[in-house]
Amino acid sequence: MSDLYAHRILILDFGSQYTQLIARRVREAGVYCEIHPYDMAESTLRDFAPRGIILSGGPASTVGETAPRLSPLIFELGVPLLGICYGMQVMAAQLGGRVEVSAQREYGYAQVYVHGHSRLLQNIEDHTTAGGEALLDVWMSHGDRVIGLPEGFKRIAATAHAPLAGMADEKRRFYGFQFHPEVTHTRQGIRILERFIYDICGCEALWEPRHIIAKSIENIRTKVGADTVLLGLSGGVDSSVAAALLHKAIGDQLICVFVDNGLLRQGEADQVMATFARHLGIKVIHISAETRFLEALAGVIDPEAKRKIIGRVFIEVFEEEAAKLPNAQWLAQGTIYPDVIESAGGKTGKAQVIKSHHNVGGLPEELNLKLLEPLRELFKDEVRQLGTELGLPFELVYRHPFPGPGLGVRILGEVKKEYADLLRLADAIFIEELHAHDWYDKVSQAFAVFLPVKSVGVMGDGRCYDFVVALRAVESVDFMTARWAHLPYDFLDHVSRRIINEVAGISRVTYDISGKPPATIEWE
């Protein structure tokens, strides 16, 4: 087996919400990478021995004495550097260039003129001007700008408002861009990053699913030994792939605990038991705990509080089950990178907390079981690739994501059994119709949301006053950003009529047309 860590890229984080997206792009190129804070210890930096370093963007200004700065060692290692947005600005500032707060900020789409010859941008373009200059369609998000190049650098890109939108020191292999090559809006962004990774840094594509599985199995066996591992199985993609990976690594030492918390989708409990216990031969303990969860959630309306309560009760159930089993010392979870990102629970802790995930923020400080998260460093697409490689069925691997707290975060405000029952039925109709009309695999995630408000309606000849549900469907590559799915009006009309006619207690159906950002995919 090739050493999948032999060629690696280091990403230094200045707090950008796009930092993990940079990592995803590097991984897509088949190269291992890690994210560390910009002020990581010099000893750790030397030990990591990267083939190249990428400096992320960030919300801070480079102008001022309190601006985050890099260790001078970064510039002395002799490895290529790529600064993105703030990363370019801080590189320029620390190497003797000049940076100012721009009077004209740039946010969103922009066209960049490619100047001169650069190894990084050679023969990469989206358009050309009448004079033959190469143009790139890019995504900008910055307030500061570089106005003076450090010694040894030349200009390689410009916009109308940022004459120095790109810079290069070819001798030292230092590069900087004011735009974001990691986002999909920058059309040639992946080509630019691959040029840096392969040609400038000399990395090879070693980060492949089969190698990841082999290394994960080795790590799991080393860490766990002969202990028994409990896995909280939800039936979603992440916990399902975690179960398959762990079962391949330790076999019967894995015991899956499936907790029916009363917040699952229609028929989900039966489906999970059929798939894992009967078809895959994995030992699954089915625990019915609806009353326990609903009692703990009674009167709670704050979404953060609900997530943490659901996480706490899950842990309590697992600990009680572990006490019944010999050698049960580990709690495994299907935590993946996006969970950690939105909880700002990664290695850097620089990003702002958007929402905590029950797999991360809901864990009590004193956990009586050791935590095992074999997918923690993987993105959703990598998890699906592993699932396919492990032989899981297509319909399971490519099932839409379902949050760990379940319907608890799809019921706005207080969670009640009545609300969950209504939502289950409405959601099942929506998903059924998506399958029937060949839309399910065309959208990335779809579900119904229960709104704790009532609306006047007319049923037959009488007035009714019942609840409202919202339908949500999005398209996304990475779940870091998403656009609302433009489902046909006739389809939405059909789904709405079915829900109102078949689910007693719902009188109105709405459709959510919010993108991410500014909205998150889940409502809570």
Curated annotation (Swiss-Prot):
Q: Does the keyword ATP-binding apply?
A: yes
SUPFAM superfamilies (alphabetical):
Adenine nucleotide alpha hydrolases-like, Class I glutamine amidotransferase-like, GMP synthetase C-terminal dimerisation domain
Q: Which UniProt keywords apply?
A: ATP-binding, Glutamine amidotransferase, GMP biosynthesis, Ligase, Nucleotide-binding, Purine biosynthesis
Any one GO molecular-function label of the UniProt entry: ATP binding
Provide the reaction this enzyme catalyses: XMP + L-glutamine + ATP + H2O = GMP + L-glutamate + AMP + diphosphate + 2 H(+)
Output the CDD domains linked to this UniProt entry: GATase1_GMP_Synthase, GMP_synthase_C
**Active site: residue positions:** 85, 180, 182
List residues of the Glutamine amidotransferase type-1 domain: 8-206
One Pfam family here: NAD_synthase
What pathway does the UniProt record associate with this protein?
Purine metabolism; GMP biosynthesis; GMP from XMP (L-Gln route): step 1/1
Enzyme Commission no = 6.3.5.2
Q: What class of enzyme is it?
A: ligase
Q: Where does ATP bind?
A: 234-240
Instruction: List, for all copies, the residue spans of the domain called GMPS ATP-PPase.
Output: 207-399
- GO cellular component terms, semicolon-separated: cytosol
Any coiled-coil ranges, and where? none
**Summary of subunit composition and partner proteins:** Homodimer.
Any idea what job this protein has? Catalyzes the synthesis of GMP from XMP.
The protein in question is named: GMP synthase [glutamine-hydrolyzing]
Originating organism = Nitrosococcus oceani (strain ATCC 19707 / BCRC 17464 / JCM 30415 / NCIMB 11848 / C-107)
| UniProt lineage | Bacteria, Pseudomonadati, Pseudomonadota, Gammaproteobacteria, Chromatiales
